[in-house]
Design a protein with these regions (language model features):
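Transmembrane helix boundary and interhelical loop/hinge segments in multi-pass membrane proteins
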Residues: 16, 20, 190-214, 224, ...
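Extracytoplasmic/periplasmic domains immediately adjacent to an N-terminal transmembrane anchor
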Residues: 1-174, 341
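Short helix-capping/hinge motifs at transmembrane helix termini and TM-loop junctions
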Residues: 40-44, 194, 198-199, 212, ...
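Transmembrane helix segments
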Residues: 28, 36-45, 280-322
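Membrane-interfacial helix-loop-helix junctions in multi-pass membrane proteins
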Residues: 166-170, 249, 301-356, 363
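Long, hydrophobic alpha-helical segments
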Residues: 176-193
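Alpha-helical transmembrane segments and their short interhelical loops
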Residues: 216-289, 294, 340-346, 350, ...
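Short cytosolic juxtamembrane segments of multi-pass membrane proteins
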Residues: 362-369
Length: 369
């Protein structure tokens, strides 16, 4: 049995290697996508244009504005002479934020009265607006503390000291890049297997495969192993780029990583083989792959926390292997998790993998003729 399966595996690898378009799709784009997404997909603010409408010539206003200018998150676009200039700048997106300091800002602070400070933010992008508000709140809090210390005022009764574990500088890239590792591994593996049988049908060689001594289960195994091998190699290459190019720390156990990777590949291989069993042409295989990939990524917690989703949608995520693999990746990269701690993520993927492969085998037997 196994020598026939190995022969079919070799045939599959040769077919992939001979296909120039396939080589380019499965090797080049994932690497390029990782590098592009690693730099472009970030929640950090950098060089956000803002304008200042300052009606106060006092020292406090100057000190506060110096703090804002010194932050790499902001870029001063200009000073305004009147409030009528605010709306045109925000309407045309020349600035995303306007700081308005009233004429009595310094006087109010010296007299220990509340000193209003207006921050006008472009709210069309709610995520950026919330980040801007958070950045400004942090700058203002530090300014208030240092102003009180410099003037000898009594400190506030409670002081917030924040310490971030696992990601001390709160770099969003440390969160996003491990997720991209899982995303690209999913895309490549599903596409390789989704096109495997469809490619044979389109080329007219699938009928020849059926008259060989190979049994259906042997054909299925021969189609599955190349996808697992390519997914494994692709994942390792992407992990190396994440660690050595983006300097994302890999603190966890490699054994725990490869257990999770193997179970994840089994889960998505089953989906790919189901799609390939149904598809008659490669175009149908591609379409079926994308129909699976889009909800799988959205419901994985890659960009939005699963806890923020409606309860019904949260139940749907329980059958998504990507959900569990992302937890494994981020735990191993940032937390230094072990296989024992990740057991709650392993067993659901194992069950999903067994069910998917069983369904793929059933579909394959009923669709092979």
């Amino acid at each position: 049995m196994w020598h026939r399966v190995i022969a079919l595996m070799i045939k599959e690898f040769l077919a992939l290697l001979k296909d120039k378009k396939g080589r380019m799709v499965f090797i080049g784009p994932p690497i390029i996508q990782l590098i592009v997404f690693g730099y472009a997909a970030t929640f950090d603010l950098n060089q956000v244009p803002y304008a200042v409408f300052n009606e106060d010539s006092g020292a406090a206003a100057r000190q506060f504005l110096q703090r804002v200018e010194g932050s790499p998150a902001f870029r001063l676009a200009g000073h305004l002479g009147n409030d009528g200039q605010i709306a045109p700048l925000l309407d045309t997106r020349k600035v995303l934020m306007v700081l308005h300091i009233g004429p009595r800002f310094t006087e109010d602070l010296l007299l220990r009265r509340p000193a209003p400070l207006q921050v006008i933010i472009d709210g069309r992008n709610s995520n950026t607006a919330m980040l801007l508000a958070g950045y400004m709140r942090t700058i203002l809090t530090r300014f208030n503390q240092e102003w009180a210390e410099a003037k000898g005022y009594s400190p506030p009764p409670a002081k917030l000291n924040i310490r971030a574990w696992f990601n001390p500088n709160l770099q969003s890239r440390w969160f996003i890049v491990p997720g991209i590792v899982g995303l690209l591994t999913l895309v490549v593996t599903v596409m390789v297997t989704a096109l495997s049988v469809a490619r044979e049908r389109e080329a007219g060689t699938f009928d020849q495969l059926l008259v060989t001594p190979l049994r259906p289960v042997e054909i299925l195994l021969g189609k599955a192993f190349p996808g697992i091998a390519i997914g494994f190699l692709e994942a390792n290459l992407i992990i190396l780029i994440a660690v050595f190019w983006f300097h994302i720390p890999l603190r966890g156990n490699l054994v725990a990583l490869y257990i999770g990777l193997f179970l994840f590949l089994l889960s998505v291989i089953g989906v790919g083989l189901m799609i390939s069993s149904i598809a008659v042409t490669q175009q149908q295989g591609l379409l079926g792959g994308f129909l699976f990939l889009v909800p799988s990524i959205i419901l994985s917690g890659f960009a939005t926390p699963i806890a923020n989703m409606p309860q019904t949608v949260q139940y749907l995520t329980l059958i998504n292997p990507m959900r569990y693999f992302l937890v494994i990746l981020r735990s191993l990269f940032l937390e230094g998790g072990s296989a024992f701690l990740l057991w709650p993520e392993y067993w659901p993927m194992a069950i999903i993998g067994v069910v998917n492969l069983a369904l793929a085998a059933w579909l394959f037997r009923h669709r092979m003729y």
